[in-house]
Amino acid sequence: MSSKLSKKKLKSLEYRSKKFDKKSQSLEEHEKKVQQKNEELEKKAADKISRDELPEKQLAQSNDKDKHSVSNPPHKTLKSKRQKGKNNDRKVILFVGNLPKDSSVETLQLHFKRAGQVPSVRIPTDKTSGRQKGYAFVEFINPKTDVISKALKFHHTIYKERKINIELTAGGGGKTEARMNKIKEKNRKWKEEMRQRVASEEQQAGEEKMARKAVADEGLESGIHPDRLRLLQ
């Protein structure tokens, strides 16, 4: 009986031993799994921190680029601003007719410089022969108040032994019907003013001539030289 009990005990002990070994193995595996999981969590946390830091670096780099672009703007941007400024300029273009065929930009600029501003000049030429067409366009950019009125007074002045004609054009401000009518009205008024000015100058010149003649006649009658008579008067 005792031998049988001992066998049972032995089997029980073997069973318990195997069970314990299994438990120990499962415990080790569990510890390994826990350790792996912790490592994975630590790795994820480190990746998240690096991802959070990356936008800050990128933002700092972006700010540096913005500062650089503000302090040193690209040439293209400056060019577009200059172009925009040019588009906002006020332009007044005069038509100049009855020009000789040997006209030049420089001599026309000198002729109109007396108005108070040097204009840009364009002299159209024939496409086939290359000869001048006998007229030009004189352009004033942002002219001062009295520049255009002075330039218009060069109408019928002499340029290279030619009496030139000057008129306002619709250039530089569009060619709408309202603007064209306005230009026509301005030209009409200006021509009327020119006619009155010429008549006034002719009248004044005639009066001065008559006055000189009267002085000369009086000098002859009195026996005194006309120049001396003017001084005495």
UniProtKB/Swiss-Prot annotation:
Gene3D superfamilies in the cross-refs: 3.30.70.330
Record InterPro entries: Nop6_RRM (IPR034228), Nucleotide-bd_a/b_plait_sf (IPR012677), RBD_domain_sf (IPR035979), RRM_dom (IPR000504)
Main localization of the protein described in the UniProt heading: nucleus
GO biological process: eukaryotic translation initiation factor 4F complex assembly; formation of translation preinitiation complex; ribosomal small subunit biogenesis
A Pfam family the protein falls into: RRM_1
Biased composition (Basic and acidic residues): 11-56, 194-216, 224-233
Listed name of the protein: Uncharacterized RNA-binding protein C365.04c
Native source organism of the sequence: Schizosaccharomyces pombe (strain 972 / ATCC 24843)
